[in-house]
């Protein structure tokens, strides 16, 4: 399902750029300054199925993304009682073959991270970092994600997720 236009190769570095260019902020205004993050989001967002065009911006949207929705369903089922889900369990189930319900997802670690952070941006989940991340103990969620500058180290310390609690 995931196909990129032209001869672009989706690398771990581009994944970090996509997160900082679109997922972190939730939108790219039409007149946004072109930098490596915005370019990566524009180049890879459509293939990752995380982007929707509006008249004045490109907007993060994973509502129609089967991978993000299947990840959310997995979190909802396993964490229904408020129990956190280890990010490693998500990697185990969505990277490679033999995932939930016999599906072969074949996602990369960075793709799983993009979808998790997109779900956090949309207010569906919160993500806790491991103790050695060097960042705040506060979870990453819709209220804090835009203030986080993501890099490879941060992404590698995604530790566990919780379903969002809404008032």
Locate each region found by the language model.
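Extended alpha-helical interface modules used as scaffolds for assembling large macromolecular complexes
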Residues: 1-167
């Amino acid at each position: 399902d995931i196909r990129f236009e032209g001869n672009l190769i989706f690398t771990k570095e581009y994944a970090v750029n996509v997160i900082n260019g679109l997922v972190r902020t939730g939108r790219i205004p039409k007149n946004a300054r072109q930098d490596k993050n915005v370019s990566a989001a524009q180049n890879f967002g459509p293939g990752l199925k995380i982007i929707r065009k509006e008249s004045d911006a490109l907007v993060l949207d994973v509502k129609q993304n089967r991978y993000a929705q299947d990840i959310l369903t997995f979190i909802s089922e396993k964490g229904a009682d408020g129990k956190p889900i280890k990010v490693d369990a998500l990697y185990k189930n969505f990277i490679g073959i033999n995932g939930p319900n016999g599906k072969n997802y074949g996602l990369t670690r960075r793709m799983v991270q993009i979808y998790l952070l997109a779900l956090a941006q949309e207010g569906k989940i919160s993500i806790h970092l491991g103790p050695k991340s060097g960042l705040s103990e506060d979870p990453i969620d819709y209220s804090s994600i835009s203030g986080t500058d993501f890099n490879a180290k941060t992404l590698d310390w995604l530790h566990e997720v919780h379903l969002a609690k809404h008032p």
